[in-house]
A protein has these predicted regions:
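Ligand-binding loop in jelly-roll beta-barrel domains
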Residues: 191-207
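Active-site segment flanking the S-adenosylmethionine/decSAM binding pocket
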Residues: 188
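Catalytic core of non-heme Fe(II) oxygenases with the double-stranded beta-helix
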Residues: 108-185, 195, 207
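Non-heme Fe(II)/2-oxoglutarate
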Residues: 1-102, 117-123
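Short hydrophobic/aromatic beta-strand or adjacent loop that forms the aromatic wall/cage
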Residues: 9-13, 131-133, 205
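Double-stranded beta-helix
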Residues: 210-213
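OB-fold ssDNA-binding interfaces and closely related basic DNA-contact patches used
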Residues: 86, 104-111
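A short beta-turn/loop motif at secondary-structure boundaries
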Residues: 102-106, 199-202
């Protein structure tokens, strides 16, 4: 008797290791945004973050919104990183990516932003109105192995989906040293959330995200 497993076609979630060059590029964009007048917050946004090298060391009280809009100069990050990932996604997906796309459009980055959070801050479950989304962690101060002895999901990034019989499932991405300088790439309509951490409340997690249409 021979038993074989049949894998059900689905859309993949990709994990990407970012090069040092591209991590530095993202920090450069954050530093430039830190020197710019915010369209709604005004001058109080300028120099609201403090750095040591490429690490965020302080977030001033004037940082009243944890979402910092970024500018991808000459589409450098999109062309060097996102476009090749889209190509690989189309190759690796079990299902036709065309079903995710509305009309015959060339991909472009609709939104591009950074979140600078203390790990005790959280983001409730939500989805984005794009085709693909990504989350790139370039500064991760947490250590899951220690804090998850009390809370097994503490500081996790969680993706929600339904299995083949329609029951809810989730994929937990652990925030530890190995998560730094990695990027997740997934369909925008996937629900996802960020759990709060119980420790490291005076340190900062830096995540750069974007939506592709």
């Amino acid at each position: 008797m021979k038993i074989r497993k049949l894998d059900v076609p689905n859309y993949p979630i990709l994990s990407v290791d970012l090069s040092d060059e591209h991590v530095k590029l993202l920090f450069k964009y954050i530093k430039k945004a830190n020197e710019s007048v915010h369209p709604t917050m005004g001058n109080q946004w300028i120099h609201t973050l403090e750095f040591s090298g490429d690490a965020v060391t302080n977030r001033k009280p004037t940082f009243t919104n944890d979402l910092m809009e970024l500018v991808d100069e000459n589409d450098e990050f999109f062309n060097d990183v996102i476009r090749p990932v889209i190509t690989q996604y189309c190759v690796m997906s079990d299902l036709a990516v065309e079903h995710l796309v509305q009309g015959d459009k060339k991909p472009l980055m609709q939104r591009f932003w950074a979140r600078i959070n203390t790990p005790d801050e959280y983001a409730p479950a939500h989805y984005h109105n794009g085709v693909f989304s990504f989350a790139a962690w370039i500064q991760v101060p947490t250590n899951n192995e220690v804090e998850q002895q009390q809370d097994p999901e503490s500081s996790d990034f969680v993706l929600h989906y339904s299995n083949i019989i329609g029951l809810p499932e989730k994929l937990n991405v652990k925030m530890h040293d190995g998560a730094e300088n990695t990027m997740l790439f997934f369909p925008s309509r996937m629900m996802h959330e960020v759990h709060a951490s119980r420790t490291n409340h005076n340190l900062y997690r830096v995540c750069v995200s974007g939506d592709i249409i």
